[in-house]
Amino acid sequence: DRILLWLQPSPSAEETGVSCTIETASDRDYLHVAALDRIAWPIAPDLFIPDGEHIWRIWCDMATLLVARRPGGSDSLSESGDIAGALVMFPTNASELCLHKIMVHPECRGSGIGTQLMQAGLAQANTPVLLTVDPSNNAAVALYQNFGFDVRERIDGYYRPHEHRLIMVHPGPS
C-alpha cells in the first residue's frame, strides 16, 4: 500500500521536540478523528475510502480508539483540532484484535507519533493483534516485523482481484 509508506521508523519525541499524550478517545473526539481520516491519506484517494463520522462515533464506544493529543489547545492542527494521530483496533470473531488503522496528521509525520500509537495499542491488547498489508509494501512489512508482527498468510484478491494482502499477526501479551 502506498498509503502506508509514511509509517517508517521515526525519531522519538525527545529527538524532535514534539510531544503528544496518547489516550483513549472520547465521544467528543470522533469528528476530529474522522477529519484526520480524510486528510491522512491524500496520496491514494482512488484506493482509499475514509470511514464516515458515524463509524468513528461507534468506535469511540465499541473499539480501542487511541488518539495522540498534541499540546496547544483544540485548534492547533488544521481540521483535526489537537489530534495529531489515531489508532483503531476492534475485536474479531477469532478472539483477536484487528488493527484497522494508524494515521498521523501530515503536519506531524516523522515525529514518532505513529510509533507511540503502535506501542500504546499493543500494550493495551490482551489478545493477538492482526493487520493486513500489501505484500509489495516492503517498508511497511519490515516496520510491522520490527514491532513483532509475523506473516500468517497471503491472500490473493483480498479486496479486489488485483489487491493482495498479507495477514500479519502480533502474538499479544506474553
Which functions belong to the PLM regions below?
Residues 83, 151-154:
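Residue-level detector of beta-propeller blades
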Residues 106, 131-141, 157-162:
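Conserved beta-strand-loop-alpha-helix junction that forms the acyl-donor binding cleft
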Residues 2-28, 170, 174:
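Conserved N-terminal entry element of GNAT/NAT acetyltransferase domains
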Residues 6, 20, 24-109, 115-120, ...:
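Acetyl-CoA-dependent GNAT
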Residues 118, 124-136:
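Conserved GNAT acetyl-CoA-binding A-motif
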Residues 1, 144, 149:
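Conserved active-site tyrosine of GNAT-family acetyltransferases
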Residues 1-4, 63-65, 163-167:
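Short hydrophobic/aromatic beta-strand or adjacent loop that forms the aromatic wall/cage
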